[in-house]
């Protein structure tokens, strides 16, 4: 994809700004991230099964589940890398809100209703009621993964203000701002876990209107780091941080009963200290390694998969329930091979379904 140029005479028609070149590294990151999200929700069934805790198959599930713990922050960073672009606000905040929030509106309304009254009630057999649904909406967790809709809407609402502050400050201002916000977020979480462990319950929780707050730092970091390209020993060093950090999260979770102090000082959370560092590291590694990569003939496939990623995030839980209705694929809480197979099937079906739905007028607004 190359920037478009104006071919008309300069004297009679003003030159149009060049269309932004597609950032294939972000496309790849988006695809990997949503595959990781599916893994977290598929393998989490076995990770939470006390009957297999500590077994080899349980550790296998932990490696996959916790090995992808960085993908949700990276999803937010990808959004920041694209949404905080100044051209998004060329026509003012009102135009931005109209385009972005109206685009999310149908999905924002449809999917909570679908998951509560179809997936939970019909597919999972848990009878839902309007009171429980409304409480879930206020809490921002009408279904397991749908907090992300509130998260994204909150960041979109704040985006024009953040972009205005960043506009004339260059990458340095963006990096400092992102670092400060992330540091405050991490410190808030750690102080809460320390105080709670000391007997003063300060557990953190977010409602629908605050789901986005802990992720502002990642949103800013995506913009600050989107053009960061490391080479040589710097790239090797950051890659080592990403790998070692991911491994440490896996080990810490698997041995948490024996390492209680680590859980207090380094809580495993999407905005915990180690996970935050790991997410930043993987983002920079991907941007650096894939900076000049071109998919060639695979460009169409990469584009379709990337554009379908948000829809996959929305539909995959329904697909998980559907796949598990097959008796041979039901035991994802104690059979690692079946769990891997279910993961692959859910990814393939979800991407295919969303790619098809995106071609249907009106329905495409939901995915």
Give residue ranges: language-model regions:
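Membrane-cytosol interface segments of multi-pass membrane proteins
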Residues: 1-185, 330-367
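Functional transmembrane helices that form membrane-embedded active or gating regions
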Residues: 22-34, 102-105, 233-246, 289-321, ...
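Aromatic-anchored segments of alpha-helical transmembrane domains
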Residues: 35-42, 113, 180-194, 241-256, ...
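Specific transmembrane alpha-helix
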Residues: 72-84, 150-163, 190-231, 272-293, ...
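Membrane-interfacial entry segments at the cytosolic side of transmembrane helices
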Residues: 169-178, 230-240
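Juxtamembrane "helix-exit" motif on the non-cytosolic side of transmembrane helices
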Residues: 190-199, 250-262, 324-330
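Alpha-helical transmembrane segments and terminal signal-anchor/GPI-anchor hydrophobic tails
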Residues: 231-299
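C-terminal transmembrane-bundle signature of multipass membrane proteins
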Residues: 278-288, 314-324, 347-359
């Amino acid at each position: 994809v190359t920037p478009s140029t104006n071919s008309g005479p300069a004297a009679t028609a003003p030159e149009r700004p060049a269309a932004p070149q597609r950032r294939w590294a972000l496309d790849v990151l988006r695809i990997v991230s949503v595959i990781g999200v599916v893994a977290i929700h598929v393998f989490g069934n076995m990770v939470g099964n006390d009957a297999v805790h500590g077994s080899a198959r349980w550790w296998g599930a932990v490696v996959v589940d916790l090995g992808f713990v960085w993908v949700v922050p990276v999803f937010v960073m990808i959004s920041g890398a694209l949404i905080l672009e100044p051209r998004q606000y060329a026509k003012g905040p009102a135009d931005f809100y109209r385009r972005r929030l109206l685009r999310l509106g149908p999905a924002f309304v449809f999917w909570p209703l679908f998951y509560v009254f179809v997936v939970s009630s019909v597919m999972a057999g848990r009878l839902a009621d309007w009171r429980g649904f409304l409480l879930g909406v206020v809490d921002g967790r009408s279904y397991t993964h749908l907090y992300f809709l509130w998260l994204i809407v909150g960041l979109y609402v704040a985006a024009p203000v953040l972009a205005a502050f960043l506009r004339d400050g260059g990458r340095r201002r963006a990096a400092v701002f992102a670092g400060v916000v992330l540091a405050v977020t991490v410190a808030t979480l750690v102080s809460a876990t320390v105080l709670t462990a000391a007997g003063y319950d300060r557990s953190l929780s977010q409602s629908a209107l605050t789901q986005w707050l802990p992720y502002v730092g990642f949103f800013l970091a995506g913009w600050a780091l989107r053009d960061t390209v490391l080479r040589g020993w710097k790239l090797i060093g950051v890659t080592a941080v990403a790998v070692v950090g991911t491994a440490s999260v896996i080990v810490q979770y698997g041995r948490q009963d024996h390492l209680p102090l680590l859980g207090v000082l380094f809580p495993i959370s999407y905005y915990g200290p180690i996970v935050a560092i790991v997410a930043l590291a993987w983002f920079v590694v991907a941007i650096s390694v894939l900076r000049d990569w071109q998919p060639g003939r695979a460009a169409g496939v990469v584009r379709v998969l990337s554009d379908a990623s948000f829809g996959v995030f929305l539909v995959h839980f329904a697909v998980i329930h559907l796949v598990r209705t097959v008796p041979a694929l039901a035991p994802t809480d104690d059979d690692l091979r079946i769990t891997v197979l279910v993961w692959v099937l859910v990814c393939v079906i979800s991407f295919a379904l969303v790619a098809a739905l995106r071609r249907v007028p009106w329905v495409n607004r939901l995915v």
